[in-house]
Amino acid sequence: MNKIIRFLFRYYRAKKLGFKFRGISSFKIPTKLSLNGKIIKLSFPEEKGVFIDFVSIFLDDDYNLARIKTKKILTIVDIGANVGFFSIAARLAFPNAKIFSYEPNNQLEGYLQDNFLELNIELQMNAVGRDSGRIQLHNCGDSNQSRVVSNKEGPIEMCS
């Protein structure tokens, strides 16, 4: 995508969400968003991966949520929610949908609870996989890079 077009797209999306965007080099994730006329506070760890997720989900709309014309989507499942940015963007795009958010990393629970406070998103602090059982989380740097490892005595439940 042309740099000017990408800048204008990001600028427009930021304005619609209630914050300013003047360029990626000086950009900081905002602590508040305007969602359907409601101001919500954002809570997140200061990590490069979280920054990249915010830009790709909210500014670049990598999931094309703004382009889906039907509002008849009734259920959305966010598996591996991290701090919940996709679920928040889905709430913006589909205000009446039932949203289920799954995240196995207990270190992110506080961020998720804060971010979902007034958004009617159902949070489950467990993993989702092919088979139900127990797992262990393997942290690989930033929180969005964590991986699950099957472990019958692991501390985290995985549902299928």
List where the protein language model places each region:
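Phosphate/nucleotide-binding beta-alpha loop and adjacent structural elements of enzyme active sites
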Residues: 1-160
